[in-house]
């Protein structure tokens, strides 16, 4: 069953301990995107001196109320699937595929941009005039694919970890936390991101003395929403490469 999610700071601390066990005490760079960007920001603040430079891409300084609500809703959807069985589904030879697929579809609403959905699918139906809308088929197919490849308890645990993210927790304030680290920091935001809007990366850049782009983040000018970092790979490779080299 799903365990306690634990804050992202615990997960970063575990990664640091693993590195020490392997004999790695200093990292040339730490790069994180989305949830990984939350981890990268924690490296930047909590593990100063361990990474020579850090890149935070499409991630917030803290999870907002809207994001908390979405994470909670997705978790509840999974748990409402009768096959979830209080998290002990493997004992019964089942998996909450329907709940996990629907939770994924909810998340996808924020992973892509609104205009992209309209331009890509519009109100076109799939195959025949009375068939499902193309966007319905797209969401269902992606939900099913995700449910077949991802574990429900892992999904719940990771959702809880994302919800716990707050770089200012226990450090006085987010501003104080960010200002404490002078290490080179690349902050990248996505122009059309609905999941973690550009204002969140702007806050990080403005309060980070090591921000390599000053008080504004580097902006990926893409209309694909949060998933732009997966699509515009040439831009991402060039931007990250220039920072890390």
Please state what every model-predicted region is.
Residues 145, 164-166, 191-196:
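Acidic catalytic loop of the alpha/beta-hydrolase fold
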Residues 37-48, 54:
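Short glycine-enriched nucleophile-adjacent loop
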Residues 181, 187-189:
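Short beta-strand/loop motif that positions the catalytic acidic residue
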Residues 170-175, 183, 197-207:
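Short alpha-helix in the alpha/beta-hydrolase fold that links the catalytic acid
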Residues 9-29, 38:
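Conserved acidic catalytic loop of the alpha/beta-hydrolase fold
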Residues 141-142, 157-177:
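Active-site nucleophile elbow and catalytic-triad environment of alpha/beta-hydrolase enzymes
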Residues 202-205, 211-245:
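Catalytic active-site module of serine/aspartate enzymes centered on a nucleophile-bearing elbow/loop
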Residues 50-52, 56-145:
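Alpha/beta-hydrolase-fold enzymes
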């Amino acid at each position: 069953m799903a365990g306690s999610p634990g804050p992202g700071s615990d997960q970063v601390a575990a990664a640091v301990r693993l590195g020490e066990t392997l004999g790695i005490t200093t990292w040339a760079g730490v790069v994180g995107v989305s949830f990984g960007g939350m981890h990268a920001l924690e490296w930047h603040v909590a593990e100063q001196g361990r990474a020579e430079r850090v890149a935070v891409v499409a991630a917030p300084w803290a999870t907002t109320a809207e994001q908390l609500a979405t994470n909670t809703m997705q978790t509840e959807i999974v748990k409402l699937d009768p096959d979830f069985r209080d998290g002990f589904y493997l004992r019964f030879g089942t998996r909450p595929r329907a709940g996990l697929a629907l939770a994924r579809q909810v998340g996808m609403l924020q992973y892509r941009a609104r205009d992209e959905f309209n331009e890509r699918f519009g109100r076109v139906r799939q195959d025949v005039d009375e068939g499902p809308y193309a966007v319905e088929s797209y969401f269902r197919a992606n939900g099913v694919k995700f449910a077949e490849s991802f574990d429900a308890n892992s999904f719940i645990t990771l959702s809880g970890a994302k919800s716990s993210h707050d770089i200012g927790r226990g450090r006085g304030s987010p501003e104080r936390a960010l200002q404490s680290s002078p290490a080179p920091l690349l902050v990248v935001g996505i122009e059309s991101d609905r999941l973690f809007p550009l204002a969140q990366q702007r806050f990080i850049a403005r309060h980070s003395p090591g921000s390599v782009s000053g008080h504004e983040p580097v902006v990926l000018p893409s209309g694909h929403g949060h998933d732009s970092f997966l699509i515009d790979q040439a831009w991402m490779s060039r931007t990250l490469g220039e920072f890390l080299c």
